């Protein structure tokens, strides 16, 4: 499969249980269930969790994402932001890393600012705290995009500065 080739290319060791480990990670990302509640068929939850964290810390998931979107259809690009409520204990102990959790009316939230190609496939994203406005994050997101024929966005991105940036690009 395409994903398997990318994983091996990104120096992820091809262990016997690689497929089920990755399936377990993807299942957890799709459903949002706690790691412990994944079906047992995906293997030991703690082992899968530790691998996921190690790959994330090493930037391997981001590299996999970039390889999966190697040839986006840039005729139309859609950008928008969406909130995700963070767990009540997510703002626990202080960390040196930015966890992208902010305070908003809904409590602790994160926000994904996403750009999609003409087929609706994600091509670029930024994750911020939930209190970050779409129009303040748009310049960063747009600057990462290859040239697009048309960029479509909702009124949260309506500003002269963003229009000028899109026209320059």
What kind of region is each of these model predictions?
Residues 1-169:
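Short alpha-helical elements
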């Amino acid at each position: 499969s395409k994903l398997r080739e990318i994983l091996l290319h990104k120096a992820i060791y091809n262990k016997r249980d690689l497929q089920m480990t990755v399936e377990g990670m993807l299942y957890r990302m799709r459903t949002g269930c706690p790691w412990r509640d994944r079906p047992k068929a995906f293997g030991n939850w703690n082992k899968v969790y530790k691998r996921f964290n190690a790959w994330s810390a090493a930037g391997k998931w981001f590299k996999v994402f970039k390889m999966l979107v190697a040839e986006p259809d840039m005729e139309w690009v859609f950008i928008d932001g969406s909130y995700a409520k963070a767990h009540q204990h997510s703002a626990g102990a202080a960390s040196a890393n930015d966890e992208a959790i902010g305070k908003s009316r809904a409590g602790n939230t994160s926000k994904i600012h996403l750009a999609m190609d003409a087929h609706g496939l994600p091509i670029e994203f930024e994750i911020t705290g939930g209190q970050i406005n779409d129009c303040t994050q748009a310049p960063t997101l747009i600057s990462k995009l290859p040239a697009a024929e048309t960029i479509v966005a909702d009124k949260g991105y309506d500003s002269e500065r963003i229009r000028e940036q899109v026209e320059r690009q």
